[in-house]
Structures are given as structure tokens and as C-alpha cells.
Swiss-Prot record:
It comes from the Eukaryota. The lineage of its organism: Eukaryota, Metazoa, Chordata, Craniata, Vertebrata. Pfam families: HLH. Keywords: Developmental protein, DNA-binding, Nucleus, Repressor, Transcription, Transcription regulation. Changing K55R: Loss of repressor activity. This is Transcription factor HES-7. It comes from Mus musculus.
Length: 225
């Protein structure tokens, strides 16, 4: 039993080593395939269309592409927003073009009319898009256009004035210390305040009903004294 267990333990690493090696090769192949597609989108080199391209050639293309990019754009130099926008637009067009090429390989079975309609609609997305308007903060009120005085809405409102009330002045507004002092200075005596202050309120009973003020008895005409 002990000899059998030792034999299985010795065969374990031998069985795992080929599996690990296979996984490592699969990872390398996947990364190289992705690198080939990325270089094809950026460089548009027809040699990169071959899916069976040698691994060494893919790596040489990658080194040449990085060397060219570092020569055009030195490291450490900040990029402007315009350059970033151009790079994004170029990336978008390259990827879209690659998708169209892949779609064309599957569109041969469709009818010519359907294929033409599909590609004409897809090619519309390759046109440059107009710049977007500036974003407006939804929390801020929308700007109002300036009003023209000659407009039919604003013109009559400017020329028409509200009617001025010609009634007697309010007692509170008519009486003021300066007004009383000016009147007293003109006549030499203090001006009476009759008519300038509001009349006192009528007396109220305890039950809440107002008490009528006492009036003198009515005068009757008599022929005798």
C-alpha cells in the first residue's frame, strides 16, 4: 500500500505539468490574437488580416507600432483635449470599419436589396457627428430671451399706465411729525389733530356686543315757551 501511494505521488506532478503548460500556451495564443486585432485596427496593415500569422511577426509589428507612437508623441508631453477627441474618433472609425468588414463576410447569403439597405444605413454612422450643445444645469432656470419694446406684447404695456387713485389720503400717511411741525410753524400754534387720526373704536360690552353711543333726545317744536 505504501509503495502504491508513493508511486501515485510521483506520477501526480508529471500529470499536472502538461496541463499547466497547455494553459500557459493557450494564454499566450489568446493574448497574441488580441494583439493582432488591435494592431490591425490601428495600423490597417493587410498582413495582420491573416489569422495564422507567425507569433514573432505579431510581436515585431507591436514593437514597430510602439516605437512609431513614441516618436510622434514623446513621453511626458501632455495631450490637449482636441488630440484626445481626434484619437477617440479615429479609434471609433477603425473599430466600426473592422465590424463592417466582419459583417460583410456573413452578408453574402442575404438578398442584394437587403444587403444594400443594411450597409447604406450602417455607413451613415461613419459620418462626422455635429458638436453637442453645451450642457445646461437642470437646477438653473432657463435663460429668457430679451424683450423688444416694439413687440406687440410689451409695447402697449409700456405706454399704458395704471390709473392713479385720487381719493383722500390715508390717515396714517397724512399725519407725520414733520407735517405737524410745518403747520404749527406757519400758524404759530399747534395744529389740531382732528381728522388726522382715526376715530376711537366704540365701547364694547362684556358679552362682546358693541354698545351704542348715547344720543341727545330729539327736539320737538312747541308753540309755547
Amino acid at each position: 500500500m505504501v509503495t502504491r501511494e508513493r508511486a501515485e505521488n510521483r506520477d501526480g506532478p508529471k500529470m499536472l505539468k502538461p496541463l499547466v503548460e497547455k494553459r500557459r500556451r493557450d494564454r499566450i495564443n489568446r493574448s497574441l490574437e488580441e494583439l493582432r486585432l488591435l494592431l490591425l485596427e490601428r495600423t490597417r496593415d493587410q498582413n495582420l488580416r491573416n489569422p495564422k500569422l507567425e507569433k514573432a511577426e505579431i510581436l515585431e509589428f507591436a514593437v514597430g507600432y510602439l516605437r512609431e507612437r513614441s516618436r510622434v508623441e514623446p513621453p511626458g508631453v501632455p495631450r490637449s483635449p482636441g488630440q484626445d477627441a481626434e484619437a477617440l474618433a479615429s479609434c471609433y472609425l477603425s473599430g466600426f470599419r473592422e465590424c463592417l468588414l466582419r459583417l460583410a463576410a456573413f452578408a453574402h447569403d442575404a438578398s442584394p436589396a437587403a444587403r444594400s439597405q443594411l450597409f447604406s444605413a450602417l455607413h451613415g454612422y461613419r459620418r462626422p457627428k455635429p458638436p453637442r450643445p453645451e450642457a445646461v444645469d437642470p437646477g438653473l432656470p432657463a435663460p429668457r430671451p430679451p424683450l423688444d419694446p416694439a413687440s406687440p406684447i410689451l409695447g402697449p404695456a409700456l405706454h399704458q399706465r395704471p390709473p392713479v387713485h385720487q381719493g383722500p389720503p390715508s390717515p396714517r400717511l397724512a399725519w407725520s411729525p414733520s407735517h405737524c411741525s410745518s403747520r404749527a410753524g406757519d400758524s404759530g400754534a399747534p395744529a389740531p389733530l382732528t381728522g388726522l387720526l382715526p376715530p376711537p373704536p366704540p365701547p364694547y360690552r362684556q358679552d362682546g356686543a358693541p354698545k351704542a353711543p348715547s344720543l341727545p333726545p330729539p327736539a320737538f317744536w312747541r308753540p309755547w315757551p
